[in-house]
Amino acid sequence: MNEPFILPVNYQGTEHEFKARFERWGYTHRIAVLIGETTVTFEPDEEGGYRALAAQPVDMDLLRTVAEKLAKLSN
């Protein structure tokens, strides 16, 4: 179930394709997305969206756009 997939995201009028993978995490899941050289982990939050965890700084608007795309895919 950890098969990689491509996540297409339209950000600032440009279509981006990010490598991503689904990860089982106990009773829930995480989705790891490679943005540039940084792996950003998205996990479900209490409101039905996704929160981002990253070790390096990443554009906040881009993270919000990716999180919204993931929320749409999970519905």
Regions found by a protein language model. Give the residues of each.
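Cysteine-centric segments in proteins
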Residues: 1-75
